[in-house]
């Protein structure tokens, strides 16, 4: 009994040797080696790189039908038959023909759209160029439209006039010519009432005065209202930022109420680093400047560009020299009286 018990124990120990719960589900290694050593089950990897014919899916063919109807290709009887064939059988070969037709029609439509876009772009470019040319021409012709005969740059004006300008008068008197003396004109006497009446008539719609007065005489007894002398200060955005309001106040201080109005005007189109001033002095070259050199003549209705506060006295003395001289003489007389 003891011998049989020991034999059973040894057999059970030997049979359980080397077993473990984790090693029960492992596959034998020789099976894996056999799987790795076998070849490809089919030749699908070779057919993948071959050129296959493009086959339309039913979804693409339905999309083709919609595009075919939109482009109006159904007007052709032959293509209409293909259209019906494709509607009945979406897997037919008629879809390939219609697809080529549709692609050609789409390419043609794209070409037409491209041409339209180019034409529209060319028209916009031409309109922009015309607008720029018209704006430049309008700015160049603004002097003639507003009655300006000459554009005066104040840098050149300061260099040429600043040396010969006196304290009271800002214009150099021309030397007398002995050979052809200027005809003397009798001064026109105006009283205060007639002057005020004339200024009121100037502000209205050029009313003609048929009755002659003591201050205004004419052979035909019809007198045209004379243009008013005034100084127009540009009030554009650029000129405002460069001190146009202060310049206008300075002109009002210097000119006063001696028949010269200081007003604001719209942008003149030549704004630079300083405000622009348009002078309406109504100079008549035929009667006042005959026989004078061009350098001595006073330009009528000039446009002064780049005007500063230091140029106010010079402009008033240059273009309104008669009234400025009267103002200076009146101030000097008042100073001597005191």
UniProtKB/Swiss-Prot annotation:
**Residue ranges, compositional bias (Basic residues):** 113-126
Q: Mostly located where?
A: cytoplasm
Tell me its EC number(s), please: 2.3.1.20
Tell me the SUPFAM superfamilies matching this sequence: Thioredoxin-like
- Which tissue types show expression of this protein? Mostly expressed in flowers, accumulates in stems, seeds and pods and, to a lower extent, in leaves and roots.
Q: Which cofactor does it need?
A: [2Fe-2S] cluster
Feature: compositional bias, Low complexity: 132-145
Q: Which residues form the signal peptide?
A: none
Q: In which pathway does it act?
A: Glycerolipid metabolism; triacylglycerol biosynthesis
Reaction(s) catalysed (UniProt annotation): an acyl-CoA + a 1,2-diacyl-sn-glycerol = a triacyl-sn-glycerol + CoA
InterPro entries the UniProt entry points to? Thioredoxin-like_sf
UniProt KW keywords? Cytoplasm, Iron, Iron-sulfur, Metal-binding, Transferase
| The name this protein goes by in its record | Diacylglycerol O-acyltransferase 3-2
- Identify the GO cellular component terms for this protein: cytoplasm
Region annotated Disordered sits at 109-145
Give the organism the record lists: Glycine max (Soybean)
Q: Which Gene3D superfamilies match?
A: Glutaredoxin
- Record family assignment: Belongs to the diacylglycerol acyltransferase family.
Q: What is any one GO biological process for this UniProt entry?
A: triglyceride biosynthetic process
Q: Which residues bind [2Fe-2S] cluster?
A: 234, 239, 267, 271
Please give the function described in this protein's UniProt entry.
Involved in triacylglycerol (TAG) biosynthesis. Catalyzes the acylation of the sn-3 hydroxy group of sn-1,2-diacylglycerol using acyl-CoA. Incorporates preferentially monounsaturated fatty acids (MUFAs), especially oleic acid (C18:1) and to some extent palmitoleic acid (C16:1), into TAGs accumulating in seeds oil. Can also use, with low efficiency, hexadecanoic acid (C16:0), linoleic acid (C18:2) and linolenic acid (C18:3) as acyl-CoA substrates.
Q: Where in the cell is it found?
A: Cytoplasm
Give the highest taxon in the source lineage: Eukaryota
The Gene Ontology terms for molecular function here are:
diacylglycerol O-acyltransferase activity; iron-sulfur cluster binding; metal ion binding
């Amino acid at each position: 009994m003891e011998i049989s018990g020991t034999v059973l124990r040894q057999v059970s120990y030997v049979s359980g040797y080397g077993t473990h719960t984790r090693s029960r589900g492992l596959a034998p290694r020789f099976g894996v080696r056999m799987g790795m050593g076998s070849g490809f089950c089919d030749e699908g990897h070779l057919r993948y790189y071959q050129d296959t014919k493009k086959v339309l899916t039913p979804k693409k063919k339905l999309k083709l039908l919609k595009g075919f109807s939109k482009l109006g290709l159904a007007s052709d009887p032959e293509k209409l038959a293909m259209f019906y064939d494709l509607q009945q059988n979406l897997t037919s070969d008629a879809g390939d023909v219609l697809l080529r037709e549709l692609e050609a029609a789409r390419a043609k439509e794209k070409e037409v759209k491209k041409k339209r876009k180019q034409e529209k772009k060319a028209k916009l470019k031409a309109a922009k160029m015309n607008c720029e040319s018209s704006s430049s021409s309008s700015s160049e012709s603004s002097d003639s439209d507003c009655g300006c005969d000459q554009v005066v740059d104040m840098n050149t004006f300061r260099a040429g006039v600043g040396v010969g300008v006196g304290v009271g008068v800002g214009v150099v008197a021309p030397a007398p010519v002995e050979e052809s003396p200027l005809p003397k004109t009798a001064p026109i006497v105006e009283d205060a009432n007639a002057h005020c009446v004339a200024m009121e008539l100037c502000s209205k719609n050029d009313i003609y005065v048929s009755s002659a007065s003591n201050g205004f005489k004419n052979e035909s007894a019809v007198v045209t209202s004379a243009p008013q002398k005034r100084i127009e200060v540009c009030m554009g955005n650029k000129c405002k930022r460069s001190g146009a309001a202060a310049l206008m106040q300075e002109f009002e201080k210097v000119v006063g109420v001696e028949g010269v109005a200081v007003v604001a005007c719209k942008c003149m189109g030549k704004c630079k680093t300083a405000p622009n001033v348009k002078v309406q002095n109504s100079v008549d070259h035929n009667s006042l400047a005959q026989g004078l050199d061009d350098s001595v003549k006073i330009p009528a209705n000039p446009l002064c560009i780049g005007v500063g506060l230091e140029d106010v006295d010079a402009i008033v003395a240059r273009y309104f020299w008669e009234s400025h001289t009267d103002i200076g003489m009146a101030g000097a007389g008042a100073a001597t009286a005191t």
